[in-house]
Amino acid sequence: MMEPHPGVFVSNVRAEEWEPDPEVPGSEMHELVHAGGVWAGLTRFTTVEGPVPWTPSQRETIHVLEGEVTIASAGGPALTLKPGGLASLPAGLETIWHITPPFTELWVLA
């Protein structure tokens, strides 16, 4: 990640720039920005060992780039997203993600 001008963040996703995601075991992430209350980047799964529980700390908007995910939450309908699919989840929503790898998403927490 580079900041060529104050507040402007630029990145190029190369294989060596993926790192383990500390909040989601079994996945890798590439961070674009983590500043001013916004956190954005990419997450990818090449394998998945069962459902992934996830509760966003802020509103999370996702865009599926590869693979498929079904997101279940208590009291709500399950959402199935494929490449091109977008969803925005409120902060604190307890979800279970059923991921079909390979899976890659662009996410923004704000």
State where each predicted segment sits.
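A short, N-terminal "cap"/entry segment at the start of jelly-roll beta-barrel domains
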Residues: 1-42
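Short acidic-glycine-tyrosine-enriched beta hairpin
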Residues: 75-91
